[in-house]
Amino acid sequence: MFAILKKYRYPLFLVLIGLLWLEVLNLLLQLDQQTLIYPDSSNYLESAQKMYLKFTGHYYRPMVMAFITGLPYLFGSSDAGIFQWSLIVNVFCWLGTSLLLFQMTKEFLSEKIAFIFAMLPFFTIGSTVLNYHLLTENIFTFFIFLSFYCLFRYYKTNNFWFLSFSLSLLLSSMLIKPGVKFFALLMLLLFLKTVLKNYKTKSMILIYGSVLMILIQIVGMKVQYGDFTISYIDGVTYHNYLFSKADCFKNGKEYHQINNPRAEYLFSLSFSDQKRVATEDAIHQMKTNFPNVVWAYGHNLLENTKTGNACVIDVVNKKNTGYFEFCKAVAYDSSKWQNRLFTLLGFLVSLYYIRQLFTRKSGEALMAMFVLYTIMLSGISSGQGDRFHLVTFPFAIFLLAKWLSETERFKRFSVPLQK
């Protein structure tokens, strides 16, 4: 027993530290006492209800998130039970991401140094607070990080099972967050030659299964709502945020996310018409209002980089403790500066590693591509605080650790012990 504890002491310490920190933040901000349910959370609850109780699909939220969220319905759970389950799943994925980060960094760092890097995601306020909300960020981050873990294992072992699992996770992730679909398809394209060489092997079942789920989602949306699409959320997002803001800039008006006439009009339409109107408006503005579209995009990108966690702003002092407002202010300011720091670090270190794509498909270069893709994609939306960028923080930490390990000064203290 002692030998097992000694062998796995670092992962066990990681889990313990993560849970302790989660409880500390919970006590300071009264996270388990909050009753606010965000519109996105209501959407995810509704998608689970549609899948498990009505056997239909959701217009905005694809099937994988609905499947994960709604599992307790199989056991007669109430809606309140879904939120309790969400906390368990979020914490599992939140801890799992740091455990994977530790496993990956100890390949080129000593275990002690890898342990320090693996702890860093715990102390990003945004991801910790989001554990208490029915949202996708921590689940999505875990899926993508596990995908890259498998990709690095494939590079090390040349075992196609790892590549198959990696690509299947990426493809499945577009049924959690549809915005990742272009990155997932690009990754599949980059490894298409290898995939085609192995198309008859048993390990391809993972990729085939993911593709089948995507086809079911697309065909189901056509049958139920009228279009071959994964989700209608993309059109709503760029119409109501990016192009509505560009239209406001054009007409000299101040943009408001709430009470947005363009958004109200769009939501009055059928889902198929929402997609059509959003697409037509995007094309029209790109032709006639391009400078303001670029300005709106840059404005969104800057806002998503410099703002803190919106969920922290909304916490309420339910227990009337005297220290609450101070802790709330510190937590928000911390999340704001963490967003700025990790976004900037992630962007810079990703630029450093993405150069390798011109010579070889290294795991670091592909991870850097994901970080840059996510940051740049965030420009189509706004008003969500650090939610867009915090999914990149663990990847930025890994790339930073990798870069530091390659410097002579840091290498002396971090090279793993020879076995």
What is the meaning of each model-derived region?
Residues S98-F123, T141-F142, K361-L366:
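Transmembrane-helix signature of polytopic, membrane-embedded enzymes
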Residues G18-L20, A114-I125, Y149, L170, ...:
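Short helix- or helix-capping micro-motifs
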Residues V129-F140:
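Short acidic/glycine- and proline-prone juxtamembrane loop motifs at membrane-interface regions
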Residues Y225-K318:
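Membrane-proximal stem/loop segments at transmembrane-domain junctions that anchor or position
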Residues I88-F108, F142, L146, L348-Y352:
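Transmembrane-helix motifs of polytopic, lipid-linked glycan transferases
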Residues Y59, M63, F67, F75-L99, ...:
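Loop-to-helix entry region of an early transmembrane alpha helix in multi-pass inner-membrane enzymes
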